[in-house]
Amino acid sequence: MLRMSTLLLRTLRDDPADAEVASHRLLVRAGYVRRVAAGIYSWLPLGYRTYRNIEKIIREDMDNAGFQEVHFPSMLPREPYESTNRWTEYGPDLFRLKDRKGNDYLLGPTHEEMFTLMVKGEFSSYKDLPLSIYQIQTKFRDEPRPRSGIIRGREFVMKDSYSFDIDDAGLEASYQRHREAYIKTFNRLGLKFNIVSAMSGAMGGSKSEEFLAPCPTGEDTYVLCEKCGFAANVEAMVTKVAPYTGEVPPAFEIFDSPNTPTIDSLVELVNAKFGQEITGADTLKNVLLMADGKAISVLVPGDREVDLKRVGANLAGVQELRLFEDEDFAKYPGLVKGYVGPQDAAKLGITVYADPRIVIGSHWITGANERDKHARYVTHGRDFTVEAFVEAAEVKAGDPCPTCETPVVIDRAIEIGHIFQLGRKYAQALGLTVLDQNGKAQVVTMGSYGIGVSRAVAAIAEQTHDEIGLNWPREIAPAEVHVVAAGKDDSIFSFAANLAEQLEASGLTVLLDDRKDASPGVKFKDAELIGIPYIVIVGKSLAEGNIEFRVRSAGSKVEFAADNAVSEILAAINN
């Protein structure tokens, strides 16, 4: 039993100054976590019990699915990550260190290489497969902007598992087993979630899906078609456009366009100057970026913004992507800021990419590469070409579903799980083969499956909290019942302690507020803040033979006869 008189717990009345989201604010105020440094947190007893309950559920579901648990170190040698090129690919996100002999190590962001090498060292035959193994381990990523408390930290805990199969059919079966186990786990955790198509990113591989917990302050944006059920992270949203079927435009012409710093001002000038009725969608934005130190231009319609996350996810191999800065323009004197067009990109040393909406044959109003001048009838395929099409424009609510063309809705969420079909990338790089039935060496195909264990604590808090505090589901709460001794009489404290012991003997986990130096009002506020699902108040009504029972999630309260309190409480909880 937890007793608040001796518990390492100090609740706070004020929000932490750096709290941006409800979970961060409430987990700190309720004494669940404490900040050590940017993106690094310590777990206090209530927080760690909650975390361990989540870990327990995940472990049970992994074990029940037939997956075997292992454990790797957090500090890993450089060499395996060089073999897969991830020592370079991870860039500044990787924590790197040297030992006293000058050997390079890293703090593991993920453990694909270690899992692959373990299986390589132990197994050599197709008879050893399929195999699925997992670990629950601390990960490290040097996030440029750690934020939102434990949602995006530099140190965090993940469950990562990997499947090993002889062929693609086996990989698909292993992938589906993990997918089903995840659905079961997230349902047990009481999370609302959507499964959406996603990009594989630095992990590599082909098929990829994310498990997203809807949350207004979530960092991930996804699209959902309420008609056909299509769902995808915005990075994976595919733009479907029809080919251009209009007339061939006349040769492009340059016109004066002073004082047009915005798309709206350009549209207003063109409509007045040429008697046209165009909109921002008829103009072409040329967004200049530096991609791994090389200048590129991304073309999108003028009524759309460029989504850098979409560009980065869809430009293969690019590690660092940023907008042009003044010093970049200085290196390319042929680029006139605010008047850039794609017509002379090759001469200027710029590689051009286009959003799929910039179809071949379409014509646009865009910069003329001269100060205070634009051009119209600039036509894709005639006046400029592009290196490739890339999903670049922001996705908007109402865009057509790529499956059924119904307008999609957009929501925000927290990523709580991600599953990948990695294929043979890591096995090939690290030489993981087994002999098949014919004695021929075959490269093993792999799947990767992750759950953010520490992040799940925050995701559940985000979805279940209310205006007065945390509100945990029973299976993950640090205790199931919070017994509050609300008064000064010894009889109240004696009855509360006895009741708590009986409830615990009945199989419930109990938090007893037996503090004698805290007022009933303070205890009630702490109970609401801490968020235990069932609250029992032993107070002044005890003199009349009653105690009060509250359901935190419903905000309901009822009185029970003190003599029958244990049976009444058990019946109410298990009803």
Predicted regions and their residues:
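NTP/phosphate- and nucleic-acid-binding module
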Residues: 1-575
